[in-house]
């Protein structure tokens, strides 16, 4: 094929990081903003307008986690809710429940719906690896999700109910719960696959994917256009029955069938890969580890007043000493 290759080094990634705050003007935790910026910069050397394929996974069910959630929830809902919750609660009391596989299985049993399973973690790649390590299961439970989103903020960790500076005496946990309460439950009253697709189209896609591409591309004066989000394409995608979208572990079936007309199957039928960087490995290597630890200095964190220095220290220690990753 006629294409260009860009190899990103740890040093290049570190050089980009100081520029990110000026691009986004707010905290933005998707690490793929780094390669997206570098690809945009390379693209801008050749063109001023580029097409983006964003929206294809959400509209045509391409994410691997869609298939996993369907299978997981299919198994869960066949078991009595009372029995599942009792078992999940008992697992949480075990002294070794902090081990990743055991903890994930315990939280999974507490889930009430497919969305609780799905909302546990937005980091698709991290979640994929975690699922694979615990026999095809994923953590669940809205409380577990909310706790994970609020962990590290003052008062956000644990069950102490401590208050912080989010305003109105609210904890970080309260803020996340309030956010999800804005959506009427009946909005997601549809099949498991359609429910998680809809959530992504309402939240993840506009608040993460589109923001990331827009900010990084415009930082280098590159205009991006998103043909998948054409009104007619969106309406067509939502009109398709699920068997046209996914079959077992294969998604985007309609798009694949179209592309097969132009690209040999052997070039297409391969495992899906996210647009990510080896952030975990990099953070354990000397240069970026030293940089990260300078930012996580307890005295610095306390002087800033945003994070709980002790909680941040525990999270970093879990990562560096035990390999526990909490994006």
What are these regions (language model features)?
Residues 32, 45, 49-51, 98, ...:
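Adenosyl-5′-phosphate
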Residues 1-23, 49, 172, 179:
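A conserved beta-strand->alpha-helix junction
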Residues 18-22, 44, 66-68, 282-284:
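Short low-complexity, flexible loop/linker segments enriched in glycine and/or proline
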Residues 12-16, 58-62, 276:
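Short catalytic/ligand-binding loop motif for oxyanion handling, primarily in non-cytosolic enzymes
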Residues 18, 37, 41, 257:
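Active-site phosphate/pyrophosphate- and oxyanion-stabilizing loops and adjacent acidic/basic residues
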Residues 13, 32, 36:
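Conserved donor sugar-nucleotide recognition element shared by glycan-biosynthetic enzymes
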Residues 38-97, 204, 210-233:
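Active-site adenylate/phosphate-handling loop in enzymes that bind or generate adenylated species
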Residues 4, 25-29, 73-78, 243-247:
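Short, polar/flexible loop-turn hinges at active-site or ligand-entry regions and domain interfaces
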């Amino acid at each position: 094929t006629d294409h260009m290759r860009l190899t990103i080094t740890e040093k290049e990634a570190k050089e980009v990081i100081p520029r990110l705050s000026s691009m986004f003007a707010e905290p933005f935790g998707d690490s793929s903003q780094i390669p997206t910026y570098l690809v945009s910069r390379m693209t801008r050397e050749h063109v001023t307008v580029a097409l983006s394929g964003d929206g294809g996974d959400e509209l045509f069910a391409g994410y691997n986690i869609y298939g996993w959630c369907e299978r997981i929830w299919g198994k869960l809902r066949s078991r009595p809710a009372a029995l599942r919750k009792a078992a999940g609660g008992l697992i949480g009391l075990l002294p070794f429940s902090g081990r990743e596989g055991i903890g994930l299985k315990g939280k999974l049993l507490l889930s009430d719906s497919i969305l609780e399973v799905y909302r546990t973690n937005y980091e698709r790649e991290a979640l994929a690896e975690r699922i694979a390590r615990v026999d095809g299961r994923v953590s669940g439970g809205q409380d577990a999700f909310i706790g994970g989103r609020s962990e590290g903020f003052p008062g956000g960790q644990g069950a102490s109910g401590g208050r912080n500076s989010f305003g109105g005496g609210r904890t970080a946990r309260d803020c996340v719960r309030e956010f999800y309460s804005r959506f009427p439950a009946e909005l997601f009253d549809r099949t498991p696959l359609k429910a998680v697709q809809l959530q992504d189209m309402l939240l993840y896609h506009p608040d993460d994917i589109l923001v990331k591409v827009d900010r990084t591309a415009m930082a280098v004066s590159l205009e991006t256009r998103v043909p998948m989000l054409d009104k007619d394409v969106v309406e067509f995608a939502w009109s398709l029955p699920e068997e046209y979208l996914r079959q077992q572990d294969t998604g985007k079936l309609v798009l694949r069938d179209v592309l097969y007309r132009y690209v040999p199957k052997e070039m297409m039928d391969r495992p899906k890969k996210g647009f990510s960087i080896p952030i975990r490995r990099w953070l354990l290597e000397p240069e970026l580890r030293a940089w990260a630890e300078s930012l996580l200095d307890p005295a610095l964190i306390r002087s800033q007043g945003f994070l709980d220095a002790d909680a941040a220290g525990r999270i970093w220690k879990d990562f560096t000493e035990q390999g526990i990753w909490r994006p």
